[in-house]
């Protein structure tokens, strides 16, 4: 089947532009319909024009006025959390059945991490891609969660300062809140916590993620196997996703429990997972794995939805 569904991308910054290149190069069920920005001089809009994609710098209102809008089935929103709320309202009014893939921390729709819960949300009109830290770490929490009950999970996402554009910087509070919540909702942890670090080092460092999971006592080999299997599943759409070293385990005995603020005393198994995410360097440099994992997860989500719509 050669039929493809048309997509528009709102936001002509780092994420939007990388996503456009991924759609143009890699998509099987989607094709570019329009690229939407608010800065007429942005590199993303200029690049879209050079690649033959229809553009507008009049935001969502401009998109709705384009003749191409009639054929748009999917919209990727790569703006900011506050902008997404307005964009959703305008688009929904203009075309009630349009599908939105939200790459901001707005989270109007359910959280989606493709390897964990995409199949549950194929029919949803708005899904939220959590955050870059969430896409990288929630699969690891879920991997432990399918072996043992997870009481607490804490993630630290370290990204290069250079890869954080104005949208990322404006959304730091939303990043921590959305990621923490999604660790609980999708990862299966009773309590989640997220920390983001922007590293100003030059040359820029690759995205690194540390995941600490406190769970009920469990077979360490089973946890390690579950983590390895999940890493492989993520690599299907983010080839640069990998374990930095072997999974580390610490048994916390009942005689010397840990005190977790808000949860009380804990004994069981502490699992530490160390990840790095290298980008595919389609538009962004390879060190910007944090942005690449977002665009890759968003494309994987929309592709699976489009496939399901075309096969219906």
From Swiss-Prot:
Superkingdom of the organism of origin: Bacteria
Encoding gene (name): dmpF
Lineage per the UniProt record: Bacteria, Pseudomonadati, Pseudomonadota
UniProt KW keywords: Aromatic hydrocarbons catabolism, NAD, Oxidoreductase, Plasmid
HAMAP family: Ac_ald_DH_ac (MF_01657)
Activity versus pH, per record: Activity increases gradually over the pH range 6.5-8.5.
Record flagged with keyword NAD: yes
Regulation of catalytic or functional activity: Is not activated by Mn(2+), Mg(2+), Ca(2+), Zn(2+) or Co(2+).
Assembly notes: Heterotetramer composed of two DmpG (aldolase) and two DmpF (dehydrogenase) subunits, which allows a direct channeling of acetaldehyde between the two active sites.
GO terms of molecular function: acetaldehyde dehydrogenase (acetylating) activity; NAD binding; NADP binding
Name of the featured protein: Acetaldehyde dehydrogenase
SMART domains, sorted: Semialdhyde_dh
Enzyme Commission code: 1.2.1.10
Organism of derivation: Pseudomonas sp. (strain CF600)
């Amino acid at each position: 089947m050669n039929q493809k569904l048309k997509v528009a991308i709102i936001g002509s910054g780092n994420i939007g532009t990388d996503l456009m290149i991924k759609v143009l190069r890699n998509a099987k069920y989607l094709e570019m319909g329009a690229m939407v920005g608010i800065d007429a001089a942005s590199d993303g809009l200029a690049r879209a024009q050079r690649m033959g994609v229809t553009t507008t710098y009049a935001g969502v209102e401009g998109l709705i006025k384009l003749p191409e809008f009639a054929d748009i089935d999917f919209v990727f929103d790569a703006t900011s959390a506050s902008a997404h709320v307005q964009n959703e309202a305008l688009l929904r009014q203009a075309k009630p059945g349009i599908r939105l893939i939200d790459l901001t921390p707005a989270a109007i729709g359910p959280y989606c991490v493709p390897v964990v819960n995409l199949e549950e949300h194929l029919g949803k009109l708005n899904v939220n891609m959590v955050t870059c830290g969430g896409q990288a770490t929630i699969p690891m929490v879920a991997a432990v969660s399918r072996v043992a009950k997870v009481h607490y999970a804490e993630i630290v996402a370290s990204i290069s300062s250079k890869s954080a554009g104005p949208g990322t910087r404006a959304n730091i509070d939303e990043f921590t809140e959305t990621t923490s919540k999604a660790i609980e909702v999708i990862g299966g942890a009773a309590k989640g916590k997220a920390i983001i670090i922007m590293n100003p080092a030059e040359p820029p460092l690759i995205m690194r993620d540390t995941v600490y999971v406190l769970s009920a006592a469990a077979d360490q080999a089973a946890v390690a196997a579950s983590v390895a299997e999940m890493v492989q599943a993520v690599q299907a759409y983010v080839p640069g996703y990998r374990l930095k070293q072997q999974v580390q385990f610490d048994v916390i005995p009942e005689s010397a429990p840990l005190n977790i603020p808000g949860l009380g005393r804990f004994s069981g198994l502490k699992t530490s997972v160390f990840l790095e995410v290298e980008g595919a360097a389609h538009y962004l440099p390879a060190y910007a794995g944090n942005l690449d994992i977002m665009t890759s997860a968003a494309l994987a989500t929309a592709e699976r939805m489009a496939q399901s719509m075309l096969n219906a």
